[in-house]
Amino acid sequence: GYIFRNGTIDYTVLDYAETRFGNIALLRRDTYCPFVVARLLQKQPDGTYIWAWGSYFNELPNAESFFHTRINELQ
């Protein structure tokens, strides 16, 4: 997937969806709580990204489950 860097942390976009309330992304990073489900991911002028809400997970299956649940809730 697409990789971006925020500070010293690389994020890989594992999955992404558009909903009627904006986007949602499943991200992987090589640090504590390596999986993030982020809502309203936005690229900044300096090339970094911000998001409005993030839920952090230690295990990929938990992050994937939450990601798909949120997509269904936001459709």
Regions found by a protein language model. Name each.
Residues 24-54, 69-70:
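Short aromatic-glycine-(Arg/Gly/Cys) micro-motifs in beta-strand/loop hairpins
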Residues 14, 26-27, 40-41, 60, ...:
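Generic detector of leucine side chains in alpha-helical contexts
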Residues 58-74:
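A short, charged, amphipathic alpha-helix used as a generic interaction element across diverse proteins
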Residues 1-17:
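Negatively charged, low-complexity tracts enriched in Asp/Glu with abundant Ser/Thr
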Residues 20-21:
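Short acidic/glycine-enriched loop/turn segments that link adjacent beta-strands
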Residues 7, 12, 45, 52, ...:
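A general marker of short, structured functional hotspots
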